[in-house]
Amino acid sequence: VSATASGGRSTGYAQVTATNEGGGTSVLDVTDPTGDDNGPGTYQYPTDSSFVAGSFDLTRFQVLSDGTFAYLRVTLRTLVPTFGALDGAQLLDVYVHVPGATATSTAAAFATRNYAISSSGAWSQRLEVQGFAAPVWVNAGGNTVGTPFVLPVQSDRTITIALPEAQFGTPGSGWGFSVVLTGQDGFSSDQARAFTATPGAFTFGVCASGGTAPICSVNPSTVPKAMDVITPPGVSQATELDPTLGAVVIQPVTVP
């Protein structure tokens, strides 16, 4: 157990962490382009120096299984302590589609995240990880499934979530994962950092100052809170996350 202190614009809590990164058999291994940590192509980082370039840039997503635990692992372009916690900048959600699950949802963690999950990725389990609140592991009804173990590793730029397969199940063919990364803000009702038309010290910008793209005129409170997602083949992140093209729906990556 490691204690995480309060600091900056963040809150603290006692965090249970795994003792190693885990491993086992690779179930799914997907890479994501470097430098697409701009949502639909226009999003900007907050201007405060606490927010380091690459902190919201997913570059890889892995699912592994050792028969006892399943491991969900993201790799980031940058993982550095922010507000006193190694994963203090990030808010990571993974929506898990399990074939045959009877109770599922396509809703985001909060309606104010401003996106939904595709019906093909309708989830029966959701994980949410951040540096300043206990990890969340719930089913589609909002009930706690179990206790996830979380390990951020700066040298590898990874955040690993270890889940007992007795509760999670053994991931395999047909399982889907909708992976969404945005910024954490413990002062926000949905735990996600807010957007403003252009970036503020502690808010993401929908566009840079002087931006002329159609999204630049959209109400910032209605844009999807997603700096980067893991997209399946043939899906453009810039298109998927653009609210001017219709409702924003996140597509899963699926185990063959």
Set out the residue ranges of the language-model regions.
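Short beta-strand and strand-turn-strand segments in soluble, beta-rich domains
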Residues: V136-T147
